[in-house]
Amino acid sequence: MSLANIIDHTALKPHTQKADILKLIEEAKTYKFASVCVNPTWVELAAKELKGTGVDVCTVIGFPLGANTTETKAFETKDAISKGATEVDMVINIAALKDKEDDVVEADIRGVVEAVAGKALVKVIIETCLLTDEEKERACRLAVSAGADFVKTSTGFSTGGATKEDIALMRKTVGPDIGVKASGGVRTKEDVDTMVEAGASRIGASAGVSIVKGENASGGDNY
């Protein structure tokens, strides 16, 4: 498997425009990234442009705060899938996790898993920078119990991104059969290698092209 095949080529900034998305899509076709990860408003366009290419369409749910109701997250998910999404990255209810309301957290994740109805992968963003190690472990266990396919470190919109320590902890917690996605601040091939060595099976990055070319990405995009 090539380096590009594990990267979700990502554009999630609120001011991302149509031309930016079309450029992202063309780059994904050229380099054969695993997916493009875009906000829900761009899913239909991405699905149309990527049909038959083998590149998946990933979108975000309850993003970036995770503070939507479960019903809202489920609606977002169904809507995204109806428009062509094949992967969804949802944000957990972080406050409920911190309040030790594990049943609420698990039900929230399960609401998205059930909305997917087997038509898309579900990745669960736990926002590691806001959690203790115990909370990270608990979040991962709840995601697995709810039927998620992946756990993911970060939105890229909070106080920090992926670290090798968090990836190792998440991999140890979920075991070998669940995906672990590193996102937030992964900007070079060296960053990717570090995350993969720690246990990541997918990378979320806006610097995908620079990464596969072995170049240093310019700018300070947290994703």
Swiss-Prot record:
Metabolic or biological pathway: Carbohydrate degradation; 2-deoxy-D-ribose 1-phosphate degradation; D-glyceraldehyde 3-phosphate and acetaldehyde from 2-deoxy-alpha-D-ribose 1-phosphate: step 2/2
Membrane-traversing stretches: none
Keyword field: Cytoplasm, Lyase, Schiff base
Reported induction: Induced by deoxyadenosine and thymidine. Repressed by DeoR and glucose.
Subcellular location as annotated: Cytoplasm
Assigned EC number: 4.1.2.4
Gene Ontology molecular-function annotations: deoxyribose-phosphate aldolase activity
Function: Catalyzes a reversible aldol reaction between acetaldehyde and D-glyceraldehyde 3-phosphate to generate 2-deoxy-D-ribose 5-phosphate.
Sequence similarity: Belongs to the DeoC/FbaB aldolase family. DeoC type 1 subfamily.
Name of the protein in its database record: Deoxyribose-phosphate aldolase
Organism: Bacillus subtilis (strain 168)
Origin organism lineage: Bacteria, Bacillati, Bacillota, Bacilli, Bacillales
Encoding gene per record: deoC
